[in-house]
């Protein structure tokens, strides 16, 4: 387990505290629709941090060609119908390019700045000329007004219990997922980013914001920035 990361509950737990069975139960929600609307029809998509395929499978059903990348073999075992690659995202170099590179699950908020830089470099390295990078970022109130909870229509409760500063601009976040038959918890490190800080991080990797895709600013379409 990585320092500052922990997970509890039934089944396998990944190094960043994610429970494989939990993620196999979580619905995809509106996220595949957001990605599909921002992507060319039938696009080749590189999904970084695919997990069990929560978004992979709906995107495949919409006619996209998805390559799913995750560092967890246990997660990738659940992916069906897509090419899978087991690798830490920040170390990935496939030697090919994609119409769309997707970095979801708030991964851009990694508590480790060097990891974040590696994630964004991987995005920039794999996006085709004329392509785009779709990034999911935290909402403005993600670390405030806690605890808060949401009851999903499918019958489980997700609760953000706390977000405590641990130094250097990083917070330790604790989340709980309560189902009728099981409970999972996850503790992880996250670095809140203002819009300005987020856009600066993209610029450092040679990317720039094309537009924000959702009213709350949590989904972003970025594109390679031409040099010179």
Describe each region flagged by the PLM:
Residues 134-197:
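SAM-dependent methyltransferase
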Residues 52-91:
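Class I SAM-dependent methyltransferase SAM/SAH-binding core
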Residues 201-228:
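C-terminal lobe and adjacent flexible extensions of AdoMet/dcAdoMet transferase-like proteins
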Residues 117-129:
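A short glycine-rich, Lys/Arg-flanked "PGG" loop and its adjoining helix->strand segment in the class I
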Residues 1-51:
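Conserved class I S-adenosyl-L-methionine
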Residues 104-105:
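Residues lining the SAM
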Residues 93-101:
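A short acidic, Gly/Pro-enriched loop at the edge of an enzyme's catalytic core
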